[in-house]
Amino acid sequence: MKIGFLTILLFLVVQTAWGQFRVHSGMTVTVNCDKSEAPVVHTALELLQRDYRAVFSDSLHCEETRGNILVGTLEVNNAVEQSKADLSGLKGMREAFLLTVLPDGRLLIAGSDSHGTAYGIMELSRLIGVSPWKWWADATPMKRKSFELPSGYRNVQAPSVEYRGIFINDEDWGLMPWSSLHYEPWYKPGRIGPKTNERIFELLLRLRANTYWPAMHECTQPFFLTKGNREVAKKFGIYIGGSHCE
């Protein structure tokens, strides 16, 4: 009787452990992501790799073959549909994402579009303990030896506001001199360049924002006239607004 009970208990424990998603220090972890994904998805993956290294002191590898983590956008990566996961929460949604543990223990990060996929990747960074304010607030993440999500874990989220972001105001006394005199001193005064904007856009991406209204005071050179700004906005999937001075 006792042997039978222990056998059943052991079977249940093994089944539970098998269905978990688990990573730990020293483990080879691979992300399966198609090269045809949009730039914002690959940008988010680069941030995740950096975050993973900061938390586990290990590398996260990105490949197009089978991995511990499957990343993909609906109608871009066929592996998402082939995973047999319930994708109903993404259909017809804008910038939505799904994180779910598959029966074989892999983690699926899927998006209804490229922004949704990128936000799902950043959600994993948040779950392992990385703050969106990591750089701006010197919020260094705590080291961990392992991280796991239970069997059947499912996390579906979508924004309720279509365009979400910030505008830069009164840059004369803060952002502009800091950027052009200290953070990017190779630019002439009056320019807020791509290095500064990359830090701003990283924060926006981590916070799931998608829109930015640049500084427009007379002391500042226009956003699109500063070389590199357009490219960094595309890299982070940021829409640039022009209604600031209304």
What are these regions, as identified by a protein language model?
Residues 1-22:
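Bacterial Sec-dependent N-terminal signal peptides
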Residues 20-158:
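Contiguous, structured surface segment used for ligand recognition
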Residues 34-37, 65, 75-79, 160-246:
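Aromatic-lined carbohydrate-binding surfaces of glycoside hydrolases
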Residues 2-4, 131-136, 210-212:
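Short secondary-structure capping/junction motifs at helix and strand boundaries
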